[in-house]
Design a protein with these regions (language model features):
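Short, hydrophobic/aromatic-rich segments at coil-to-beta transitions
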Residues: 1-5
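Active-site- and interface-proximal helix/loop "cap" or "latch" segments in soluble metabolic
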Residues: 7-86
Length: 87
């Protein structure tokens, strides 16, 4: 299992930590800062799920006028982690 840390942009959370197993499933998603109800719920919902599917679902989900959201930023983090694994 590989762990990743991502610094999101233009959102309330300051850091996203997560792990990917050998089959590219998400584990141990943690948001530092941000909404204390929604973000732990997202982490529970995505636990053990296919990272590509999660990124596809969360990508483009905005929060207000920010043009992004913590969920959208998680999709970016996943995309970057998967790209790094393939490189």
């Amino acid at each position: 299992m590989e762990t990743y840390t991502f610094e999101p942009q233009r959102v309330c959370s300051k850091r996203i930590d997560f792990a990917l197993d050998e089959q590219a499933r998400l584990h141990d998603v943690k948001f530092l800062g941000g909404c204390p109800g929604n973000l732990p719920a997202i982490a529970k919902l995505v636990e053990g799920k296919d990272a590509r599917e999660v990124a596809d679902i969360l990508r483009g989900n905005p929060c207000g006028s920010r043009g992004t959201s913590c969920a959208d930023q998680l999709s970016i983090a996943i995309d970057q982690a998967l790209a790094a694994r393939s490189a």
